Every structure is written in C-alpha cells, then in structure tokens.
Amino acid sequence: MVILLAEMTSSYSSQAELILRRLFEHAIFTADPMETIAEYLPEKPSSRVVIIGAGKASARMAEAVEYVWGKCDGIVITRYGYGRPCKGIEIIEASHPVPDETGVKATQKIVELMH
C-alpha cells in the first residue's frame, strides 16, 4: 500500500508540475511585447515616426515596433542587460531604479530628439 501511495503522489506531483509549467510558459508568452504589441499596431503612418521609451520592457517593445513597421527613428532607455537589437531606434542601457549619468544623458538625448 505504501508503494501505491508513493506512485500516486509521484504521478499527481508530475501532473501538477506539468500544469504549472504550461501556465508559466503561457504567461511569459502572452507578456512578450513581440507577441502582443505587433498584433495591435496600426499601419505605419506615412509621416516620420519617432519612437521614445523607458523601462525594462521598452527595448523589446521597440524591437517589436521595428519588426512590424521596419526601421524607425527613436531612443529607448532600458535597464542594463535588457538591450535588444534594433535597426534605427537607439537602445541605451542605464541604471535602474536609481538613475546614473548614462540615464541622465539618455534622457537629454530624448528631449533633444523631440525638438
């Protein structure tokens, strides 16, 4: 009887682990800007588009915009280690949550770009 209970517990544990793993993977997939933003972007405007952004997910969002619209101008500030490859949008990695000199300079670049 002990062996049977151990097998049942092991089987239940494996099924629960599989369900939790699938839920986790689905949550990660649906939170990926490449999967969500791309679906909701309108057609690219015919006029100049400038993308600006800040935050940990902003570089991936910029990458998604360029995936759909092609090369765009812009600057995005993200946390160190969160940079993504973009064709035209400049991705600047800076400190978070406490700003560093790189973040301050990047913010100044955004202000200059918008003028």
Predicted segments — roles?
Residues L5-H115:
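Non-transmembrane, aqueous-exposed alpha-helical and coiled segments at domain scale
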